């Protein structure tokens, strides 16, 4: 039994002293160090002692870091990988290093980085990613790095940074973002304001400069002139017809999304109907209502016709098209959305009572009812439903109906005499 214990301890001692052949392992200043720098390595060698806290793989020829590359060294506190040929850091390559405090990936060729791995590195204090090929950093990349003190992103290919990127870094004291080809458009204005007001040390600010547009090339971000910028706004309204459109006979639902903002926002329709969700990210028809070249539709006339001016037409509107129609606008400064619920009810079959029960008490403060002439009629907080009767020709006649408690809500707009459409207007 005693011999068995001796063999067991000998095995443990051997494992503790194991070290990959190209590397030097030992203790220094109370840290377990594995030095594999300048070894002409093309991959991370296996066989490290599990108690290693500092690992240097600098100045090798590593082309990438695969998933689980450092699974053998879970207690690692410092990892040095500078001056390699790393292009890709795969998801899971760094995620297991929850004790890591210093990470140096500088002077590589990294363009593909698993930013989600950083979410597990909450102890990180130093992150060096300068002199790489990074073009994009997600807004939430640093969300867990509340202990980070120094961040180096200089000498990359970053064109912009999302507002709020550095907000989670409450301990940050040093930031380098110079020598990046920034696009000085509305999306970068926040960075100028933040850099001028933050207590974080940001050296070489004259080298944080614009690459585009051409008129601003070379201008330091700190001296960027005021730009005409505004976040998107949207107003979703009903229109009885679409000028110049060739519509098929029958009922027509026409919506118009009025979008404002600088730079000009991108318009996107999100339609939720019984059969699923329809996304329309660009116009799919011309003014004649026929599909534009390249539009993926089965016929020459799409079911949901999105025009370049912000209008959306649904000819022959029926039960299959009931649902929620949302207009979304997005630019560099943010997004805005407005929605309308659309359903059919047959007059004389309890449709009005159904609508009254469904929407009773759901007041939308500050909304307005749109007439056939697309003029907004002021409505009080109790005006929350617009009832629309469309004629077969698609040319409704307007009349306003007053409601009382227990019946249809007030502020209803009645159009025509055949098919009932109701809209519950909401804005986000």
Swiss-Prot record:
GO biological process: cell adhesion
Cellular component GO terms held in the UniProt record: extracellular exosome; extracellular region; platelet alpha granule lumen
Main subcellular location of this protein, as a coarse class: secreted
Signal sequence bounds: 1-18
Domain LRRNT: 19-50
Full protein name: Immunoglobulin superfamily containing leucine-rich repeat protein
Occurrences of domain LRRCT (ranges): 180-231
Taxonomic source organism: Homo sapiens (Human)
């Amino acid at each position: 039994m005693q011999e068995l214990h001796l063999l067991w301890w000998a095995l443990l001692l051997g494992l503790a002293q194991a070290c990959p052949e190209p590397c030097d392992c030992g203790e220094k200043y109370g840290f377990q160090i594995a030095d594999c720098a300048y070894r002409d390595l093309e991959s991370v060698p296996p066989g490290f002692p599990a108690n290693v806290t500092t690992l240097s793989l600098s100045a090798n020829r590593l082309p990438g870091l695969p998933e689980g590359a450092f699974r053998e060294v879970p207690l690692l506190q410092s990892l040095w990988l500078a001056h390699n040929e790393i292009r890709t850091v795969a998801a899971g390559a760094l995620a297991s290093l929850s004790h890591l405090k210093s990470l140096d990936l500088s002077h590589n060729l990294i363009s593909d980085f698993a930013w989600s791995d950083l979410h597990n590195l909450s102890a990180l204090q130093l992150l060096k990613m300068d002199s790489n090929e990074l073009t994009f950093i997600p807004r939430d990349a640093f969300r867990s790095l509340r202990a980070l003190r120094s961040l180096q992103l200089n000498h990359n290919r970053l064109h912009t940074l999302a507002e709020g990127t550095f907000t989670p870094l409450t301990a940050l004291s040093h930031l380098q973002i110079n020598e990046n080809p920034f696009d000085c458009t509305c999306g970068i204005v926040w960075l100028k304001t933040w850099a001028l007001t933050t207590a974080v040390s940001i050296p070489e600010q004259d080298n944080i400069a614009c690459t585009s547009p051409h008129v601003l090339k070379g201008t330091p971000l700190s001296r960027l002139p005021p730009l005409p910028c505004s976040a998107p706004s949207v107003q979703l309204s009903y229109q009885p017809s679409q000028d110049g459109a060739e519509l098929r006979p029958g009922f027509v639902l026409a919506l118009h999304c009025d979008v404002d903002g600088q730079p000009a926002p991108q318009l996107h329709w999100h339609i939720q109907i019984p059969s699923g969700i329809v996304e329309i990210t660009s116009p799919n028809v011309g003014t004649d209502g026929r599909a534009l070249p390249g539009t993926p539709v089965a016929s020459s006339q799409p079911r949901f016709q999105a025009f370049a001016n912000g209008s959306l037409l649904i000819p022959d509107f029926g039960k299959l098209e009931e649902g929620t129609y949302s207009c979304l606008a997005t630019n560099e400064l943010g997004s805005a959305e407005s929605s309308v619920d659309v359903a059919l009810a047959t007059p004389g079959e309890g449709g009005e009572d159904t609508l009254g029960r469904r929407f009773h008490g759901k007041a939308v403060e500050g909304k307005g009812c749109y007439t056939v002439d697309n003029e907004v009629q002021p409505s009080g907080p109790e005006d929350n439903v617009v009832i629309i009767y469309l004629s077969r020709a698609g040319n409704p006649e307007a009349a306003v109906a007053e409601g009382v408690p227990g019946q249809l809500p007030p502020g209803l707009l009645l159009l025509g005499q055949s098919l009932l459409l109701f809209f519950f207007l909401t804005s986000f």
